[in-house]
A protein has these predicted regions:
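Broad, structure-driven detector of short, well-ordered beta-strand segments within folded domains
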Residues: 34-38, 79, 124
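Repeated scaffold domains used in trafficking and secretory/extracellular systems
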Residues: 21-27, 70-82, 116-123
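Mature extracytoplasmic domains of secretory-pathway proteins
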Residues: 46-104
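Hydrophobic transmembrane signal anchors and adjacent membrane-proximal interface regions, especially
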Residues: 2, 26, 64, 122-124, ...
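Acidic, small-residue rich beta-repeat scaffolds with periodic aromatic anchors
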Residues: 82-145
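Sec-dependent bacterial lipoprotein signal peptides
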Residues: 1-19
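N-terminal export/targeting and maturation segments
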Residues: 14, 18-69
Length: 145
């Protein structure tokens, strides 16, 4: 009887480790107070999709979590900044706009803005099995977390 209680958790452990629950952060002003963070959640190990969330934060003033829908575990998420200071988030063909003044502004875009996407700041992507933010730096990128 005691052996059964030990074997059951050991059999369940590999199933739980297959789930994705991680995140990476883009530090806007090179500070931890003003950031965009991407969170990936895969609550069911057999599901091939992950739920994507964007956390917009300018501490201590505001912080909000917005849903970006679903994606694959290796989906790339691009971050652009327009001259007004707003950010355009691109997940595949889907685009969203958000801001960090109140952290409340968030909307899905049906098409690329007429004035353009703005400056590419970097991309959230999986490298060596880990979600990282790869900052766009004058033609060459460097991985940061």
């Amino acid at each position: 009887m005691r052996l059964r209680h030990l074997i059951l958790p050991l059999l369940a452990a590999p199933l739980l480790t297959a789930c994705v629950n991680d995140g990476a952060t883009y530090e806007i002003d090179n500070t931890r107070e003003h950031v965009l963070s991407l969170i990936r959640e895969q609550p069911l190990f057999w599901d091939s999709k992950v739920d994507l969330f964007l956390v917009v934060s300018r501490m201590p003033s505001c912080m909000r979590r917005h849903s970006l829908g679903t994606g694959s575990p290796v989906s790339k998420v691009e971050v652009y900044q327009v001259p007004s200071g707003a950010f355009i988030i691109k997940v595949g063909k889907r685009m969203f706009v958000t801001e960090t003044q109140t952290c409340e502004g968030f909307a899905k875009l049906s098409e690329e803005p007429a004035e353009g996407m703005g400056e590419l700041k970097g991309t959230f992507q999986v490298k060596k099995g880990e979600l990282v933010f790869v900052k766009e730096e004058s033609g060459e990128a460097s991985a940061t977390q």
